[in-house]
UniProtKB/Swiss-Prot annotation:
Gene name of the record: NOG2
Recorded family membership: Belongs to the TRAFAC class YlqF/YawG GTPase family. NOG2 subfamily.
Organism this protein belongs to: Kluyveromyces lactis (strain ATCC 8585 / CBS 2359 / DSM 70799 / NBRC 1267 / NRRL Y-1140 / WM37) (Yeast)
Biased composition (Basic and acidic residues): 468-486
BP-aspect Gene Ontology terms: ribosome biogenesis
Protein name: Nucleolar GTP-binding protein 2
Highest taxon listed in the record's lineage: Eukaryota
Ranges of biased composition (kind: Acidic residues): 487-504
């Protein structure tokens, strides 16, 4: 009995519980059951033939004889699938036109709507050329003709061939540039603006690899979050990318997130949120794993988008924006742990990556992009944190721009100096205070300038771009941001004054008595 029990346990342990007398056809000493089933998988789906080669049993879908079938007599097979009257169509078109610019209205079931009929722009404009309106027949032919010769582009056949080949070559180059680089080939060109020569370092964030990463993130995302710097929201907004999404991907949701709102006064952040909310849903955010702001509002907004798309198993949320605006930091804040590499320098994120936030919500991190623009100077690009300061040549030439953007009192409080006349004097005073001197006691202008630029970009020096006047929440002096210690001190002084005022009437009554 012990031997049989051991044999039974051995079969269970090895997964061979079937009786040894029952075998699969083809199983022998050389092929076990698993190998025979694997080989039968390749033989399946073929026809069976006899010794003469005639087909005895046809393979699946090989037999030409079709069984007799009958289609159910239903008029829905031959009618229109979706029908709408002209009155309903015009009413829906008017309602769509009224709510089209409202960023808080979402159009559902876009795939089932005749968007070509609802789009007023496509229906209003005619694709045909208006030749007769510009030049009628009477001015070209007949007795009232105003010209003797027709206008032709070329005087000879050779000239026409050369001009055609040149135009075709230019068109092909433009098509190739737009297809490979997309938005990278588009620049904001206006009359009176010329493209100035810049250093190679100021073209960071414009490579083909970065734009390919951006397009992958946009194509894979259902909701796109554009991260802006609260100190300069309009400067760090990629206008060409937002226009591309509005025209090419209107079914994707785009929202703005004002990050680093802890570096500006509360009224400035509120004014920028009010101004940008007219275009897209906007949230104020402070990225921090331990002490964040706006995290609950952002998660609640993502849950609302998830509820809008109940038909999908999950939704993807992509983060785009300028370098060093805090895209990876926001993802770490939402996850409450470090899942993305972050650094106070631009270009830390090299490729896109997927992060799971919830069961139905996924996050996509994207490298920072810098759309090319002829309006942006080297100073503007540097002050937005796009370029690493240690790679900039002659950094002392950008210090006058910092002195214009920042208040004198903030610089005095940060570096504990006062009485400078210009940027050179400002750099020299900081160098001598910190002991950063070269041979002969000369100040290290380059090293101190890089330190000032890093302090400017990393928030150690208070500065911000003031919001539009009509969107200001309160009439306060720009840059008047109080530190927490000063606010607590003022609150304590006010409480002491109130206590003194309450004690004075009591003391007067005691004296009278």
């Amino acid at each position: 009995m012990g031997t049989g029990k051991k044999e039974k346990q051995r079969r269970i342990r090895e997964g061979n519980t079937k009786d040894g007398n029952l075998r699969v056809k083809g199983e022998n000493f050389y092929r076990d059951t698993k190998r025979v089933q694997f080989l039968n998988m390749y033989k399946g789906g073929r026809s069976v033939r006899n010794a003469k080669g005639d087909i005895i049993k046809a393979a699946p879908l090989q037999d030409t004889a079709a069984p007799t079938a009958r289609v159910a007599p239903d008029r829905r097979w031959f009618g229109n699938t979706r029908v709408i009257s002209q009155d309903s169509l015009s009413h829906f078109r008017e309602a769509l036109g009224e709510n089209k610019r409202d960023s808080y209205q979402v159009l559902l079931r876009r795939n089932k709507l005749p968007m070509s009929l609802l789009n007023e722009k496509d229906s209003a404009e005619s694709p045909t050329a208006k030749i007769l309106e510009t030049e009628p027949f009477e001015q070209t032919f007949g007795p009232k003709a105003q010209r003797k010769k027709p206008r032709i582009a070329a005087s000879s056949l050779e000239e026409l061939i050369s001009s055609t080949s040149t135009d075709n070559k230019t068109f092909e180059e433009k098509q190739e540039l737009d297809s490979t680089l997309g938005l990278m080939g588009k620049q904001e060109e206006e009359d009176g603006w010329t493209q100035a020569a810049k250093e190679a370092i100021f073209h960071k964030g414009q490579s083909k690899r970065i734009w390919n990463e951006l397009y992958k993130v946009i194509d894979s995302s259902d909701v796109v979050i554009h991260v802006l710097d609260a100190r300069d929201p309009l400067g760090t907004r990629c206008k060409s990318v937002t226009d591309y999404m509005t025209n090419e991907t209107p079914h994707k949701h785009l929202i703005y997130v004002l990050n680093k709102c802890d570096l500006v006064p509360t009224w400035v952040a509120a004014a920028w949120v009010k101004h940008l909310s007219k275009e897209r849903p906007t949230l104020a955010f402070h990225a921090s794993i331990t002490n964040s702001f706006g995290k609950g509002s952002l998660i609640q907004l993502l849950r609302q988008f998830s509820q809008l798309h109940k038909d999908r198993h999950q939704i993807s949320v992509g983060f785009i924006g300028y370098p060093n605006t805090g895209k990876s930091s926001i993802i770490n804040t939402l996850r409450k742990k470090k899942v993305c590499q972050v650094a106070p320098i631009p270009g830390e994120t090299k490729v896109w990556q997927y992060i799971t936030l919830m069961k139905r919500i996924f996050l996509i991190d994207c490298p920072g992009i810098v759309p090319p623009s002829s309006k942006d100077s080297e100073e503007d690009i540097l002050f937005r944190g796009v370029v690493r300061v240690e790679h900039v040549s002659h950094p002392e030439q950008y210090i006058p721009g910092i002195l214009k953007r920042c208040k004198r009192q903030h610089l005095e409080r940060t570096y504990e100096i006062s009485g400078w006349k210009d940027s050179v004097d400002f750099i020299e005073m900081i160098a001598r205070k910190q002991g950063r001197l070269l041979k002969g006691g000369e100040p290290d202008e380059s090293g101190v300038s890089k330190q000032i630029l890093n302090d400017f970009n990393r928030g150690k020096i208070p500065w911000f771009v003031p919001p539009p006047e009509k969107d200001k929440i309160e009439e306060k002096e720009p840059g008047d941001k109080k530190r927490p210690a000063e606010e607590n001190q003022e609150d304590q002084e006010e409480e002491e004054k109130e206590q003194e005022e309450q004690e004075e009437p009591v003391s007067k009554k005691a004296k009278k008595e």
